[in-house]
A protein has these predicted regions:
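A conserved, positively charged/aromatic
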Residues: 101-103, 113-125, 242
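Catalytic donor nucleotide-activated moiety binding site of glycosyltransferases and closely related
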Residues: 31, 41-53, 181, 202-232
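A donor-sugar binding/catalytic signature common to diverse glycosyltransferases
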Residues: 81-92, 102-104, 241-278
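Catalytic binding pocket for nucleotide-activated donors in carbohydrate/polymer assembly enzymes
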Residues: 261-307
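A short, glycine/small-residue-rich beta-strand->loop->alpha-helix junction that serves as a flexible
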Residues: 1-10, 188-191
Length: 334
């Protein structure tokens, strides 16, 4: 489970507990980043298993996690598993006869979908994503039922957010006077910018504007400490920092979509075209994709000159909450 997924399932868990009075169990793999986020979210998740570094370690860690999950889940005795495509979780649910509901917005993640969707009862994803991208994972004649919603997963925790500028000022930042940046996943195989490509953008921004940086990796503080940037070293939920920024610049998608939902211009440097980003853009949300340094700076200049503006209109009337199809499934309406 990634930090984004913990945010999603923590939010879905609270929603289902409140609307249906259901009892929920949230689990996550044990990493430093996940523990820090879990502490912010109220320690709701139980940690089960770890990650491996190479193929054999990953396989062994997955097998050990299945055993641990089987014990925990069997004692909890749930009616449903609600998860991202997690081979270990889905295998346990299948083995224990538990119905499975899968969420996803990453059709490019081939292996985990191939190992989970055919064993799942329900598959929920945004209508912004072309259905054909997921069809290769659906077994013909199988039992997986597809449900779509007009929205993005980030709405689950952005909706109802109330800005608090004191959380920004504590870092010495003046509201609406800084850029918020987050480095990319430079170790991901699909990322082609390289460390220096993103650093070049941050350097350019810091020459004329205040820049706050939320690290992705432990060594990011060292990687960018030669630049004039404010490193947010403690664990944070980024919504306040995003809301009060001039704009966000990120190598990933989650922060960009969060900011766009808040009406804040966001620049994403993610190398692949993401359907949910394009869907938000088509509805007028200020999310922009850059594929080069020059394109990124052109967008940023548009933000600085005012040709690209904040959007004040609420997202609530345009988008469907991702919990709605889940609620209908659990209530037996679909």
């Amino acid at each position: 489970m990634t930090p984004k997924q913990l945010l999603l399932f923590n939010s879905l868990s609270s929603y289902i507990e409140k609307t249906l009075g259901a009892k929920t169990l949230v689990t996550a793999r044990d990493t430093g980043e996940m523990r820090r986020l879990n502490s912010i979210l109220g320690e709701k998740a139980k940690f089960v298993g770890t990650y491996g570094k190479n193929k054999k370690e990953k396989l062994t860690a997955e097998a050990e996690r299945i055993i641990e999950l089987a014990e925990l889940v069997d004692s909890f005795s749930p009616d449903y598993l609600v998860s991202y495509p997690s081979p270990s979780a889905v295998r346990v649910a299948f083995g224990l006869g538990i119905k499975t509901v899968i969420y996803s917005d990453t059709p490019h993640a081939f292996h985990v979908h191939a190992l989970t969707i055919p064993l799942s009862d329900y598959f929920i994803f945004s209508s912004f994503i072309d259905k054909i991208k997921f069809e290769r994972f659906i077994t013909k004649g199988g039992w997986t039922r597809i449900f779509r919603y007009k929205g993005v997963e980030e709405l689950a925790w952005v909706e109802g957010y109330t800005p608090n500028e004191e959380k920004v000022r504590k870092y010495g930042l003046e509201p609406y006077k800084y850029f918020l940046v987050r480095p990319p996943e430079i170790f991901a195989s699909y990322y082609g910018w390289g460390t220096e490509g993103f650093k070049r953008i941050v350097k350019r921004l810091s020459e004329n504007s205040k820049v706050a940086l939320i690290p992705r990796y432990d060594d990011d503080a060292l990687r960018y400490n030669d630049l004039n940037v404010e490193i947010i070293s403690e664990p944070v939920l980024g919504l306040d920092l995003e809301y009060y920024s001039i704009a966000t610049v990120s190598g990933g998608g989650t922060m960009s979509r969060e900011a766009a939902l808040l009406g804040v211009p966001s620049v994403t440097l993610f190398p692949l075209k993401i359907d949910v980003d394009a869907g938000l853009r088509s509805l007028g949300f200020p999310i922009y994709r850059a594929t080069s340094y020059e394109e990124a700076m052109k967008i940023i200049n548009g933000i600085l000159t005012g040709s690209i503006k904040r959007v004040s209109e609420s997202a609530a009337g345009k988008l469907e909450h991702p919990a709605i199809p889940l609620q209908k499934i659990l209530e037996g309406d679909i």
